[in-house]
């Protein structure tokens, strides 16, 4: 019997969560990949840390998998953000080897201009995740015909989002 490696764990998680909600899993994979590319471009973290943060990015909406809310992704990404953030934080903190990074999930919907009110060793990555998450959410909504103000991300720079992740997103390939 072979040892399970991180690639196997990723595949198991994706296949399992995809059976519950393909839409949420697709969003999670896009956000995780975007976060990976931003951190890779930033070149400030070890590959091991980038992989851990990418897994957190993929699991950032794990709290949505409570059966009564999983089908309402857009509502929980735009309006009711704290319930799934708290559930996701608890999942990561108590049921995963990434417990030291659970606060990233808890705060991934916190406005950037409120970061000074909390203590976390991961606020920089949290800011990157928040941008990647919102960017994919608005991109998906725009594709469905919902009008998304083109200047939203510029208007919200350093209010809702840190300017740094937007800079990284625009430059990372």
What are these regions (language model features)?
Residues 1-99, 117-122, 140, 173:
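Acidic/His-rich, divalent-metal-binding segments that scaffold phosphate/diphosphate chemistry
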């Amino acid at each position: 019997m072979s040892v399970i490696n991180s690639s196997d764990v990723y595949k198991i998680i994706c296949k399992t969560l995809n059976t519950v909600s393909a839409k949420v899993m697709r969003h999670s994979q896009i956000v995780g990949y975007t976060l990976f590319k931003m951190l890779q471009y930033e070149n400030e973290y070890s590959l091991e840390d980038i992989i851990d943060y990418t897994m957190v990015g993929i699991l950032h909406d794990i709290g949505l998998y409570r059966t009564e809310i999983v089908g309402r992704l857009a509502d929980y990404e735009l309006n009711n953000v704290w319930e799934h953030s708290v559930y996701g934080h608890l999942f990561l903190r108590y049921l995963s080897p990434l417990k030291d990074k659970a606060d990233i999930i808890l705060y991934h919907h916190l406005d950037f201009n409120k970061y000074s009110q909390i203590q976390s060793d991961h606020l920089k990555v949290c800011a990157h995740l928040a941008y990647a998450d919102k960017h994919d959410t608005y991109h998906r909504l725009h594709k469905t015909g919902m009008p998304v103000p083109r200047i939203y991300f510029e208007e919200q720079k350093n209010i809702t989002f840190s300017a740094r992740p937007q800079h990284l997103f625009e430059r990372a390939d």
